[in-house]
Amino acid sequence: MKIGVFVPIGNNGWLISTHAPQYMPTFELNKAIVQKAEHYHFDFALSMIKLRGFGGKTEFWDHNLESFTLMAGLAAVTSRIQIYATAATLTLPPAIVARMAATIDSISGGRFGVNLVTGWQKPEYEQMGIWPGDDYFSRRYDYLTEYVQVLRDLWGSGKSDFKGDFFTMDDCRVSPQPSVPMKVICAGQSDAGMAFSARYADFNFCFGKGVNTPTAFAPTAARMKQAAEQTGRDVGSYVLFMVIADETDDAARAKWEHYKAGADEEALSWLTEQSQKDTRSGTDTNVRQMADPTSAVNINMGTLVGSYASVARMLDEVASVPGAEGVLLTFDDFLSGIETFGERIQPLMQCRAHLPALTQEVA
């Protein structure tokens, strides 16, 4: 099973809590995180894109770096780990993304890929005057289909004459082209999102579900597997989890309860309000899960809380689910979390037993 880190491009990572570590996103922080991840044989690093935060006492995600420029910098200071940036496709023409991706492919030596997002949070785009109207909620995957077709043209042949409802290319050129086939990833959980991933993505991200229920996402992975079978492609699921670990189950649980007790209710209310604005995409979207009050303090990603041995066991359970090819991990404290994962959790995981011995620790 592949292991990736979801780097904290926004302030405070993924805990919407006054009791969680409070920090700003910086290049130096993310460089330290990704270099540690590479040292511990993580397979990939991904950054999201967020253009407006949730506010509240913690100013959650009000402070964000930009994904492509951050990952270009991280590509230059790593040598093995795969690097993914996220394109907010309403903000960037596909020909520009194609050229930026080819540039980072050159920087990284063929280790770069692109995560495509359609955009669901209206205020991110309304503030710039580029929200296309609420009809976009029901047409966003039509838009993304044209977008990726332009990308594939430009990466494949260096030229596109694509004509569609959203994009018109007229002898559009991009050169140099990527040195290896460019990987495209997506994070669709709606039927439309999974159908898109089945046709165009190399793999699809999905949310884990619940606290210490590592296989609860299995129906989502099964839906993705079924959608991919319809297209004759192999598109695996990569599952998002937060790891909160300590020496004992009780110590880890105490951390989790402490974070929940400090939930930033103002920021969470804003998230709930935004999640209700898309009335056209169905009830199975990522944002619906994010705003569920059950565990909104970490946007309801799957949460693994326990001793190092318990977390290792639960991750092995994740690996046993058909269609689950990897996990994307966040941590309550990224630097110490990756270190304890690499030193104390990963060595106990049967699904990572193939890894080579560690070299000297990264500075």
From Swiss-Prot:
Reaction equations catalysed: uracil + FMNH2 + NADH + O2 = (Z)-3-ureidoacrylate + FMN + NAD(+) + H2O + H(+); thymine + FMNH2 + NADH + O2 = (Z)-2-methylureidoacrylate + FMN + NAD(+) + H2O + H(+)
EC class (word): oxidoreductase
Record-level GO BP terms: alkanesulfonate catabolic process; nitrogen utilization; uracil catabolic process
Keywords: Flavoprotein, FMN, Monooxygenase, NADP, Oxidoreductase
Keyword Oxidoreductase applies: yes
Family classification: Belongs to the NtaA/SnaA/DszA monooxygenase family. RutA subfamily.
Gene3D superfamilies membership: Luciferase-like domain
GO MF annotations in UniProt: alkanesulfonate monooxygenase activity; uracil oxygenase activity
Amino-acid positions noted as binding FMN in the UniProt annotation, renumbered to this chain: 49-50, 115, 124, 140-141, 190
EC number(s) per entry: 1.14.99.46
Role summary: The FMN-N(5)-oxide reacts spontaneously with NADH to produce FMN. Requires the flavin reductase RutF to regenerate FMN in vivo.
Name of this chain's protein: Pyrimidine monooxygenase RutA
Pfam families: Bac_luciferase
Induction remark: Up-regulated by the nitrogen regulatory protein C (NtrC also called GlnG) and repressed by RutR.
PANTHER family: ALKANESULFONATE MONOOXYGENASE, ALKANESULFONATE MONOOXYGENASE-RELATED
